[in-house]
């Protein structure tokens, strides 16, 4: 057990509802039960009881559940009081519980943090709880459930076990240098190392899919005024999210829409038309547009095809391309093909994909949807997949770098000591995902992002 105090919080969302739940965890959970209920319910059995105030008057009535340690979510004694979901009733009951000495309000994510600290789940599973609550699509929810049930962690634990065994073999090579068999050159270590590298590559691929499901893709629509940017936003969103007129400069601020393409979250951002600003309001809008462009995963460069026959971005607008970050992916959208008679199609112009479409009548929109999925490497078949966060990707990439460095030390430098160190660092990076090696500061940041009752 890592804590001696007892915490309480509302486990259901704020507001009115049919049921409201208060959760208590810690060594005084049984004291709370005795005080509020007049008894400690039989473990893991639902008991319908009155919830009593200090003067023995009834505050509410409902179901009480008691889970003695270690067989509870947090690994501590846990009491759940399930009453009516009125905010006044729940607040009165919460105040009554807080009158009991040694009880305090839980910090955000503290229940999950205690479950982690008491080895009821690892850090990746704890994060999956928050991801399940925040899931924005059915696929994201399924993947979060998989993570909660240990799908991600099992991959990590398997690789950590493989690295442990490999380190033992390498240490043997270091400790017995005079053996007839040259451990570093017999091919066994290289074969084992390649197996772990291959395992890690597979997990990184799955993790990138999981990150897409969780984080989504930020796409910024940019171009000159009246190119059809807002019409494209509306076409992708499937509703009139932006005002569309023939007047150039109608959009003066950033507009955001959140949609899904076969389960992939897509954050679409419509920006003000880029030109020399005619007033201060438009200038601010254009500056905000550039801020969004520079933070995008991909830019849809909108071109009014009735105004130019040029197809490469540098020909169409050299000043725009000169300001773009060189690593930022760009897709050219030649809009208004309904007016030019151009067929809806996707081609490439140099390094840039180009899509001819009509945002107004929807022609070519499905081509764009498919292109965005393909550009991000998204696979809608995520059976057995898991969600991943940016910190997970960073840890996996760090581990991959150390394994590649280790391979160089093995094959070219023939250095067992340096190989052993790279294997240790790779193992440490992987263990940060499940929380085996994680700083208290990182734990605080992770769990503080949870809701209060989790």
UniProtKB/Swiss-Prot annotation:
- Describe the function of this protein: Exhibits a very high intrinsic GTPase hydrolysis rate. Involved in the addition of a carboxymethylaminomethyl (cmnm) group at the wobble position (U34) of certain tRNAs, forming tRNA-cmnm(5)s(2)U34.
Q: Which residues bind GTP?
A: 226-231, 245-251, 270-273, 358-360
Name the chain's protein: tRNA modification GTPase MnmE
Q: Which organism is it from?
A: Proteus mirabilis (strain HI4320)
Q: Which residues bind K(+)?
A: 226, 245, 247, 250
Give the cofactor note: Binds 1 potassium ion per subunit.
Query: Belongs to which family?
Result: Belongs to the TRAFAC class TrmE-Era-EngA-EngB-Septin-like GTPase superfamily. TrmE GTPase family.
- Tell me the subunit arrangement: Homodimer. Heterotetramer of two MnmE and two MnmG subunits.
Write out the GO cellular component annotations: cytosol
EC annotation? 3.6.-.-
Q: Does the keyword Cytoplasm apply?
A: yes
């Amino acid at each position: 057990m890592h804590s001696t105090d007892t915490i309480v919080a509302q486990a259901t969302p704020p507001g009115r509802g049919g049921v409201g739940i208060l959760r208590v965890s810690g060594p005084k959970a049984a004291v709370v039960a005795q005080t509020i209920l007049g008894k400690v319910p039989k473990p893991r059995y639902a008991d319908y009881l009155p919830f009593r105030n200090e003067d023995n008057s009834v505050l509410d009535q409902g179901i009480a559940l008691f889970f003695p340690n270690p067989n509870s979510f947090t690994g501590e004694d846990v009491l759940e009081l399930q009453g009516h979901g009125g905010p006044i009733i729940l607040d009165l009951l919460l105040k009554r519980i807080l009158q009991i000495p040694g009880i305090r309000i839980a910090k955000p994510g503290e229940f999950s943090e205690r479950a982690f600290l008491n080895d009821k789940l690892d850090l990746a599973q704890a994060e999956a709880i928050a991801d399940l609550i925040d899931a924005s699509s059915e696929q994201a929810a399924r993947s979060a459930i998989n993570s909660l049930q240990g799908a991600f962690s099992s991959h990590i634990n398997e690789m950590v076990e493989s690295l442990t065994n490999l380190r033992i073999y390498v240490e043997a090579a270091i400790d017995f240098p005079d053996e007839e068999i040259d451990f570093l050159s017999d091919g066994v270590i290289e074969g084992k190392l390649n197996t772990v590298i291959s395992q890690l590559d597979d997990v990184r691929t799955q993790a990138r899919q999981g990150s897409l499901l969780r984080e989504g893709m930020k796409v910024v629509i940019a171009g000159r005024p009246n190119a059809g940017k807002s019409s494209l936003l509306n076409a992708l969103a499937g509703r009139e999210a932006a005002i569309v007129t023939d007047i150039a400069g109608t959009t003066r601020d950033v507009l955001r829409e959140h949609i899904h393409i076969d389960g992939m979250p897509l954050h679409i951002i419509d920006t003000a038309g880029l030109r020399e600003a005619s007033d201060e309001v438009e200038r601010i809008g254009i500056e905000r547009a550039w801020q969004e462009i520079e933070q995008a995963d991909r830019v849809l460069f909108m071109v009014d095809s009735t105004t130019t026959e040029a197809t490469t971005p540098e020909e169409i607008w050299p000043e725009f391309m000169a300001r773009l970050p060189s690593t930022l992916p760009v897709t050219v959208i030649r809009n208004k093909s309904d007016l030019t008679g151009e067929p809806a199609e996707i081609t490439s112009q140099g390094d840039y994909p180009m899509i001819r479409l009509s945002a107004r009548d929807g022609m070519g929109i499905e081509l764009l949807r498919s292109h965005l999925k393909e550009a991000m490497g998204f696979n809608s078949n995520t059976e057995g997949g898991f969600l991943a966060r940016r910190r997970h990707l960073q840890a996996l990439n760090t581990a991959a770098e150390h394994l590649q460095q280790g391979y160089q030390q093995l094959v070219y430098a023939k250095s067992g000591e340096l190989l052993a160190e790279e294997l240790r660092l790779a193992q440490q990076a992987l263990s940060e995902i499940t929380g085996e090696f994680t700083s208290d500061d990182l734990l605080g940041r992770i769990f503080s992002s949870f809701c209060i009752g989790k």
